[in-house]
């Protein structure tokens, strides 16, 4: 009798173990591939939401001799999205945020690519305070007292046009 022979049941067990390991490896590889394919699309969906299908309504505001064309964000969804992912904002264009009632409103710049200035505006149109906001930051920028409106413009717009705290805007909805 040879000492280095392997019985048939032992060979069968070795082949069965190898087959199970191969199947497990294939399943693991398929799972990893599926996860790898899903991650970029999930990350992309979080960073680049689909822009609104319909354009927002606009209104014309005036600050003395200066005319502003403002998109109106007057729903929770439009206020939440604001100017996120926009790559440009024309000269006298901005976004007017309209709230149901006065409150101390706070804004941040998550996913906002443009540097902006924001004017917090009381019910009567008086600017309460103006803040400059850096792109893609989460620092809070808040009204100094309850306001019903906030107007975002390109950073420096208010300063360049001599519009300061206490100035009154006309044409608010």
Give the positions of each predicted feature:
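Bacterial N-terminal signal peptides
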Residues: 23-40
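Compact, glycine-rich, soluble single-domain proteins
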Residues: 46-173
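Sequence-pattern detector for short linear motifs
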Residues: 6, 22-24, 82
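N-terminal secretory signal peptides that target proteins for export/translocation
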Residues: 1-20
């Amino acid at each position: 009798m040879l000492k280095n022979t392997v019985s048939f049941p032992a060979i069968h067990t070795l082949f069965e173990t190898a087959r199970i390991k191969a199947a497990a490896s294939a399943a693991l590889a398929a799972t990893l591939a599926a996860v790898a394919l899903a991650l970029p699309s999930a990350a992309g969906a979080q960073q680049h939401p689909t822009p609104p299908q319909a354009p927002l309504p606009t209104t014309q505001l005036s600050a003395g001799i200066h005319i502003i064309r403002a998109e109106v964000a007057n729903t929770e969804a439009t206020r939440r999205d604001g100017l996120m992912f926009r790559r440009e904002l024309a000269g006298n264009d901005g976004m007017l945020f309209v709230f149901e009632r006065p409150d101390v409103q706070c804004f941040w710049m998550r996913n906002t690519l443009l540097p902006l200035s924001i004017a917090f505006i009381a019910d009567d149109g008086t600017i309460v305070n103006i803040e400059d906001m850096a792109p893609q930051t989460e620092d809070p920028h808040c009204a100094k007292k309850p306001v019903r409106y906030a107007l975002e413009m390109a950073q420096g717009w208010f300063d360049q046009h001599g519009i300061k705290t206490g100035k009154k805007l006309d044409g608010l909805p």
